[in-house]
Swiss-Prot record:
Compartments in which it is found: Cell inner membrane
Main location: membrane
Keyword Secreted: no
Protein's UniProt keywords contain Signal: no
Entries under Pfam families matching the protein: BacA (PF02673)
This protein's name: Undecaprenyl-diphosphatase
Entry's Gene Ontology cellular component terms: plasma membrane
Amino acid sequence: MTLWQAFILSLIQGITEFLPISSSGHLVITRELLHWQDAGVAFDAFTGLGTLTAVLFYYRKDVCSILYHWFRQFRHCDAPPAPEAKLGNQLIVATLPALLIGFMVKDHIDALTHRPLLIASTTMIFAIFLAAADFWGRKKLSLPETNYRQAFYYGLAQTLALVPGVSRSGITLTAGLAMHFSRESAARFSFLQSIPISAAAGGYGLWKLATNPSDFSWQLIALSYVTATLAAYVCIALFIRFLNTVGMMPHVIYRLLLGAYLFFVFM
């Protein structure tokens, strides 16, 4: 992989990771269209850690507060958990389904990553679901009103993102809006929910890299990490800023057009 290819792919990863348009789908399609080889374990691990860094930094106050109160609840077992501790518990509940199912079916999912027509189909189908949830959802619930059943539903939704083209942020936003959460609350839970699963995926990638060393350039890795981090942070900030005024329809329209284009190219 050249530095130019690493820059393009990590930029795509950063831009698409937190937008409801599927980062994995865009990476696969870019490689297919440009006939680039798979970037490899090192690239995947460090770009994933880059987007993780971005969301951690953007929500650093929330993350610190959640961690503080989550550990504190064990010293005060006789008192009800603080809202931040409860949110931490809910994020664990929302992470477990994708973590467990992903571990069991990873090899099968990897086999789907080179099927452009599948990506085209999921891109379009789940765009329609996102549009329906945004249109009919009542958008009245706030994040503190989340219960454990709803957190579990967020987790089940996240498991669907194992399929290329679905979009992790897209399907969890769809779930939140369908459960009548406000756009801001659904986005905040979705982005916070990405932290544990991204950390697990990054850790797994680093473990694979450590146990199966391969040739890679630290210059390439550094470029990929920094590019993904900066691009992801800017996208999170812009997405949250314009969420209520822009809504989901631009993303829905983009996904429908992208899916149609992929069918045209790969049919």
